[in-house]
Amino acid sequence: MNFKKGEVLFFNKPLGWTSFKVVGHVRYHICRRIGVKKLKVGHAGTLDPLATGVMILCTGKATKRIEEFQYHTKEYVATLRLGATTPSYDLEHEIDATYPTGHITRELVEETLTHFLGAIEQVPPAFSACMVDGKRAYELARKGEEVELKAKQLVIDEIELLECRLDDPEPTIRIRVVCSKGTYIRALARDIGEALQSGAHLTELIRTRVGDVRLEDCLDPEHFKEWIDRQEIENDEDNN
């Protein structure tokens, strides 16, 4: 392997890790292994700390391929709690409002999901990395400032109801989504809740695929040190 010339690595991001932490962890162990102080490493699509799943990292000259990977379709499996919302649309914040769910049936959920197929407009979450007047939206939102973000067009290629537990004390649904770059599944949860005349937020999110890369193709960052120590390394000094 030649990390300076460029390698593409696939990881299953652990729960609680930021995307930044994954990149830093991988960079540290590559630099240690090949004996350099710095190396360009970047990822092809962030995942929230509370999400898990496929992350593609590029090293060295392969970082030029990041944009290519960003445009690949992504597949997610998401669990939504119905009847309650949070400011961030996930478990990062406490529930701020509750709504009735007694009118929701499996048939209503399935019919509602079809409305999200194809080209749709989506307003990103205030707690997101979108830029507002040169600052990240989440920086403003965490200060309690009002954040107004414009709707963005995106494409939902597939949406499927995998599980529907409406009789539970905290009703949940589990869905599979195949979507384009720029889709916020947290915002999709918000919009599905509203379309059901209720509320919803994300309680679990797994990115199961990016392009042709699936979870079974991925390394565990927590075992990356052991993995890289077993690899045969090319140290071609002409490829800085």
From Swiss-Prot:
GO aspect biological process, one term: mRNA pseudouridine synthesis
Coiled coil regions in record: none
Pfam families with a match to the protein in the record: TruB_C_2, TruB_N
GO molecular function: pseudouridine synthase activity; RNA binding; tRNA pseudouridine(55) synthase activity
Enzyme Commission number: 5.4.99.25
Catalytic activity: uridine(55) in tRNA = pseudouridine(55) in tRNA
Enzyme superclass (EC): isomerase
Keywords, ordered alphabetically: Isomerase, tRNA processing
InterPro entries the record matches: PsdUridine_synth_cat_dom_sf, PsdUridine_synth_N, tRNA_psdUridine_synth_TruB, TruB_C
Positions of the catalytic residues: 48
CDD domains assigned: PseudoU_synth_EcTruB (cd02573)
Keyword Isomerase: yes
Gene3D superfamilies: Pseudouridine synthase
Membership in a protein family: Belongs to the pseudouridine synthase TruB family. Type 1 subfamily.
Purpose: Responsible for synthesis of pseudouridine from uracil-55 in the psi GC loop of transfer RNAs.
NCBIfam families linked: TruB
HAMAP family xref list: TruB_bact
Protein name, as recorded: tRNA pseudouridine synthase B
Lineage per the UniProt record: Bacteria, Pseudomonadati, Bacteroidota, Bacteroidia, Bacteroidales
Gene name as annotated: truB
